[in-house]
């Protein structure tokens, strides 16, 4: 959702991908969260999960069984949002010809844009579509849900300290909902990037997606699921971005090269851009904003893409040591670079030129993200601005390292982070850019 902006260690499996950085910042690559057990009445045990990922503590994270089974009631879910639009995944390497043909027909950016339009329309129509709040039901299960949300907050505080701090400005309901989404994203990420990633299979991800369906249907399995189930029953959050994130996990099991930026764009949407679409309905749009809903959602998507592209550029050497290249292969070829140049870590003039182009692209997405960030509810802006400013500085550090991202890890020094956080807070207090733009037009 941030001492480096993130810390990283090698994954324990060749199928592991890098830790995906999304709108959440300060997410160290520690292996798993030790989740405290909370005593609830026992229920019949469910079918065994497809894997068991355990941390140094007594409880696993990142797999289907995490805490005690949830026996409390959950608020009835919202009616299904109409018109779900699925974004088809790129094919594995052996289907590259089919992938190229499909990409030529409908570019990934257009497919993702269609999803953004759908999400924006659903959010705009949400007040008319939502079921009346079940206040009595919420009060009846408040005790158990409070414990669930508190645990989500503990996980967020431990693994995303700066992001957690920034959420303190949000209203309690929004803050807790963001924590619940963060925890689900982290658990999903651990499926293919955790200590048991070598045992992960497509079937396990299918079961995780089935469990997601249960969450949205108001049938949570454990306390962390219950927190998310309550969140999606309270806010107009659509299931499709969650499904698409799982699709990104599937991609990491089968694909280690990306032929073009079109392919890479879709991957970045899956593992990072989706988070923006998940969280905007919770963060809300400022009542003063004069921007259309689509602009805000496109900005949230752009921040996820920018963060992920930055993450990719920072971790080129680390990924190469795992046999992975998350760079557009056609652009590498046009720059006169080969896979051997990547695996050998050659910092040449050609590499510097190539990296300058990649950094320029990432910065363009950051600029687009600024447009959406300023339109959010004021109390929700600080964590978004913190993510944007801190991650953008990683690009500066790559340049400062003379584009050596093979053996040098770019990170934001603590002093710069300290300066960036109040700057992010100041930006969060400014009027939406759409209001400032209109004011400048009327005064001129």
Swiss-Prot record:
Coiled coil: none annotated. One of its GO terms (cellular component) is plastoglobule. SUPFAM superfamilies: Terpenoid synthases. Residues 1-54 form a transit peptide. It is an enzyme of class 2 (transferase). It is a peripheral membrane protein. It catalyses: 2 (2E,6E,10E)-geranylgeranyl diphosphate = 15-cis-phytoene + 2 diphosphate. Its main location: plastid. Its EC number is 2.5.1.32. It comes from the Eukaryota. One of its GO terms (molecular function) is squalene synthase [NAD(P)H] activity. Keywords: Carotenoid biosynthesis, Chloroplast, Isoprene biosynthesis, Membrane, Plastid, Transferase, Transit peptide. PROSITE patterns: SQUALEN_PHYTOEN_SYN_2 (PS01045). Induction: Induced by drought stress, salt stress and abscisic acid (ABA) in roots. GO terms for biological process: carotenoid biosynthetic process. It is found in: Plastid, Chloroplast membrane; Plastid, Chloroplast, Plastoglobule. Expressed at low levels in roots and leaves. Belongs to the phytoene/squalene synthase family. Catalyzes the conversion of geranylgeranyl diphosphate to phytoene. Mediates the first committed step in carotenoid biosynthesis. May play a role in regulating carotenoid flux in response to abiotic stress in roots. May control flux to carotenoid precursors that are required for abiotic stress-induced abscisic acid (ABA) formation in roots. This is Phytoene synthase 3, chloroplastic. The lineage of its organism: Eukaryota, Viridiplantae, Streptophyta, Embryophyta, Tracheophyta.
């Amino acid at each position: 959702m941030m001492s480096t902006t993130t810390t990283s260690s090698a994954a324990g499996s060749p199928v592991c991908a890098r830790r995906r950085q999304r709108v959440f910042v300060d997410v160290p690559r520690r292996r798993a969260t030790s989740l405290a057990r909370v005593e609830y009445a026992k229920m019949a045990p469910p079918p065994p999960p497809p894997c068991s990922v355990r941390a140094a503590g007594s409880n696993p994270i990142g797999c289907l069984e995490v805490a005690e089974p949830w026996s409390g009631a959950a608020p009835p879910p919202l009616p299904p949002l109409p018109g779900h639009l699925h974004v088809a995944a790129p094919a594995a390497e052996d289907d590259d010809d089919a992938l190229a043909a499909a990409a030529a027909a409908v570019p990934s950016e257009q497919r993702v844009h269609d999803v953004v339009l759908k999400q924006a329309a659903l959010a705009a129509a949400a007040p008319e579509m939502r079921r009346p709040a079940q206040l009595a039901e919420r009060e009846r299960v408040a005790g158990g849900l409070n414990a669930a949300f508190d645990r989500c907050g503990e996980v967020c505080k431990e693994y995303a300290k700066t992001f957690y701090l920034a959420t303190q400005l949000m209203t309690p309901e929004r803050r807790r909902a963001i924590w619940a989404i963060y925890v689900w994203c982290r658990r999903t990420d651990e499926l293919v990037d955790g200590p048991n990633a070598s045992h992960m299979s497509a079937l396990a991800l299918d079961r995780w997606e089935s469990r997601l369906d249960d969450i949205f249907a108001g049938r949570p399995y454990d306390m962390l699921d219950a927190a998310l189930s309550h969140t999606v029953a309270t806010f107009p959050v659509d299931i499709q971005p969650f499904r698409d994130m799982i699709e990104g996990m599937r991609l990491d099991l089968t694909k280690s090269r990306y032929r073009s930026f079109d392919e890479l764009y879709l991957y970045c949407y899956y593992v990072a851009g989706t988070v923006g679409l998940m969280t905007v309905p919770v963060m809300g749009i400022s009542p003063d904003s004069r921007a259309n809903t689509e602009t805000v959602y496109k900005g949230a998507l752009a921040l996820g893409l920018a963060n992920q592209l930055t993450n990719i550029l920072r971790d080129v050497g680390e990924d190469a040591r795992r046999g992975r290249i998350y760079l557009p292969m056609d652009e590498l070829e046009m720059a006169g670079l080969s896979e051997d140049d990547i695996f050998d870590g050659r910092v040449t003039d050609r590499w510097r030129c190539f990296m300058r182009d990649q950094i320029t692209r990432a910065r363009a997405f950051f600029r687009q993200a600024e447009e959406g960030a300023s339109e959010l509810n004021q109390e929700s802006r600080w964590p978004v601005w913190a993510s944007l400013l801190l991650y953008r500085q990683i690009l500066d550090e790559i340049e400062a390292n003379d584009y050596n991202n093979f053996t040098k890890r770019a990170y934001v020094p603590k002093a710069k982070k300290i300066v960036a956080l109040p700057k992010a807070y100041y930006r969060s207090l400014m009027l939406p850019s759409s209001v400032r733009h209109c004011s400048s037009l009327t005064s001129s």
